[in-house]
Amino acid sequence: MPMIDIDWLKDHVEVPEGLTYEQLAKDLVKVGLEEEEIHSSQVTGPIVVGYVVDATPEPQKNGKTINWCHVDCGDEWNETDEDGNKVPRGIICGAPNMKAGEKVVVTLPGAVLPGDFKIEPRKTYGHISNGMCASERELGLGDNHNGIILLRQYGFSEAEYEALKPGQDAMHLLHLDQPLLEINITPDRGYTLSYRGVAREYHHSTGAAYTDPAVALNEKAPEPADYQPGTPVDIDVEIDDNNPIHGVPGCDRYYARIVKDFNPNAHTPNWMRRRLIRAGMRSISLAVDVTNYVMLDLGQPMHAYDLDKLEGPIVVRRANEGEKLTTLDGKEHDLSVEDLLITDSPNGERGSRILGLAGVMGGLYGEVTADTKNILLEAAHFDQVTIARSARRHKIPSEASRRFERGVDTALQPAATQMAAELMAKYGNGEPSEHPNDVNNTPRAKAIHFKASEVARVAGLDVDINRISDILTDIGCTVAGGGNGEFAVTAPSWRPDLNEPCDLVEEIARLVGYDQIPITVPPAPVEGLVGLTPDQQRRRRVADELAEFGMVESLSYPFVGDDDYKAFGFDPEATKKVSVEIANPLYGDRPYLRREILPTLATTVQRNIRRGIENVSLYELGHVYLWDPNAPAIPALPGGVRPTDEQLAALDAGLPEQPDHVAGILTGLAEDDGWMGGKRPVDWSDAVEAVRRIAGRIGAAIELDQPAADDVPVQWHPGRAARVMVGDVFTGWVGELHPRVNEALGFPAHSAAFELNLTALFATLTGKPVQAKPISTFPPVKQDLAFTVDETVTAGQLENVIRKAAGANLESIELFDVFTGEQVGEGKKSLAYAVVFRSPSKTLSAEDSDAIRKAIVAEAAEIGAQLRA
């Protein structure tokens, strides 16, 4: 995230004297730039400027040569000899660039360097070293550790260097005593990855006077050669994108300008080097440092090429299959046809040589070296999606790609190149060309039709229409109209995130202050349904019922992979074909979305069991994703534009079905040991009871249908699982998990589970209110009925027959006995029910109850049931 230096910020906006980093953080957070951290210096003094009086080389037995030096550190810090006179400090230094007559940075005893490295007098190589001459890396100023810092070569002007005195505070000189503010920015506000952008936001927060540096730079930039009749361009540039992503060109502006007769030996000025280092970038060379500095200051990534190595035209194109590129970091990359490249044309072969991966990183060929005298400056505007994909594909999160993928100002290229050219001319004696080439295909910004009333409707803020206009103008928008409360607003070139009225409302709310939004309860709509939908109410009832049953709700990630498929006995390859695959999965070993909840819920149960909790009763409500391989392809739509109704319908048609499911897993003991009885392990009946409770709570008339063993899915026990049916509608499974699944997951034996398709289950309900029956005051008639039936007849089937025959006089029915044996015959079983009859209008006589009994017996005979004596 960006590091903010108050001294640099002052270049673009007025800040009060004595502004602290803590106050700066408070000011910026008001406009949405959050404080990540205020970084204090890792270095403490004393650290001073030293003058090397002498440096005597002393070869050592190990082949190394050290220098025994005497360094003048000023009267305050020099040593005192036996006579009480101040004399230079004796210091051992092994750096190869140490020599007499140089001014260096001396860390004195008591100083602490990064990594908690404490400086103390120590005896080494036969001398007492009373301090240390420091390198950039030792002070945390960069990566250079090839030698100590020689202030003569550290970017000071001749006059500044001569003014440096021994004993002068080097902490302040090198800004080692200054903190930095690191801020966190949102992906849609890429312009704040620059001091230009942060200064603008500080202005919005405090009202401080702000000057946009790009305005003056654009005015000074020369007209492109195309606008100067008869003037040749610096170098020909062609944009040839034959594979745009989502129809958006990978490059819509490429600005090229030449700087000739550049001095490759010129040093980066100290102020620029210091700012780059404090921003977290190392100083490389003047040419490279200038492009990096312009990027940090204005927000425009740039690239510098050695012009003498290039042959025009420069061609911006997509990569071809099989092409490779070795980038500046020395790594070779296999290119994708989606990658956008910068190429030149050696020997007339147009676009045949790759110079770099556009907007991400340059290649080895064409880079600026210590011999470069003529430079081609590139400032371009690249598509956000193209750059983001290339950076992630090749794992190159460069500073340039971070900015391009968030959106760069389409009007900034001439200003950035002008600034870079001026700096190279001033510090490198280069001669900027006056004939730049500007290939500009950027689309014209569209006006947004904006109603002032949207601010109150969306954000709840009462903002005066004139203030709305002022705010939009202040952020850079062009505002027209307003007489009738409606504006035509054109977003500035640096705000690609402003596309719709809601974006403008967000900006107004941000700058008025989120703390100014009144706290109000949204009013319920006057017309239509109010509150939860019927299905939402049913979902809550299901959750409440399972919680009352003693189960605990869980929420798992909906991601699955090969291990989950194998644990549940699924064929991984067959399951993948009908599963939704995630393009950029959170977990590499779980790249698919679940088709059932049980596999993901099982991972939560596993985690509990591994931590010693075996008695688990968890349930989860959530979506599953049922991919249809024959579904139409989802169309690719351009960004920044609201899709049409037809496009939305095409998107919807290609989406997978996403029904609501509820699933539960019960393991271990259903009942603990106690005074009422012994331990009872979980079995299929506990899962069935949970399903029955769900059905009873929402008023669903479910039936359990036990299929043949061969028809039971692989994850269920073939003899202890049943389909959950509502009439002819299949709504799920309930029973024990297959022993193989329990073993694979590490579950106790006989672990039970259920999974219901709530979308299908809710669809079977009429939605009509349940009519409560009045409580009858007449006495009940209780009878026990035992029937002999075939083994294939289920208790549920016979119960439905009894309910139908008894009619309105049936108050309750309960199965209390199932019996098989010689007494009932082979292939038969006995089912006994306790039934209660009660009339709402009279006392049932013996004749009434006998008639009901006969009706039940007659109806039961239709399915082969015989009443036992």
UniProtKB/Swiss-Prot annotation:
Its cofactor is Mg(2+). Residues 443-519 form the B5 domain. Residues 776-868 form the FDX-ACB domain. SUPFAM superfamilies: Anticodon-binding domain of PheRS, Class II aaRS and biotin synthetases, Nucleic acid-binding proteins, PheT/TilS domain, Putative DNA-binding domain. NCBIfam families: pheT_bact. This is Phenylalanine--tRNA ligase beta subunit. Its EC number is 6.1.1.20. PANTHER family: PHENYLALANINE--TRNA LIGASE BETA SUBUNIT (PTHR10947:SF0), PHENYLALANYL-TRNA SYNTHETASE BETA CHAIN AND LEUCINE-RICH REPEAT-CONTAINING PROTEIN 47 (PTHR10947). It catalyses: tRNA(Phe) + L-phenylalanine + ATP = L-phenylalanyl-tRNA(Phe) + AMP + diphosphate + H(+). It is found in: Cytoplasm. GO terms for cellular component: phenylalanine-tRNA ligase complex. It comes from the Bacteria. One of its GO terms (biological process) is phenylalanyl-tRNA aminoacylation. Mg(2+) binds at residues 497, 503, 506-507. Belongs to the phenylalanyl-tRNA synthetase beta subunit family. Type 1 subfamily. It is an enzyme of class 6 (ligase). The keyword tRNA-binding applies. GO terms for molecular function: ATP binding; magnesium ion binding; phenylalanine-tRNA ligase activity; tRNA binding. Residues 41-162 form the tRNA-binding domain. The gene is pheT. Binds 2 magnesium ions per tetramer.
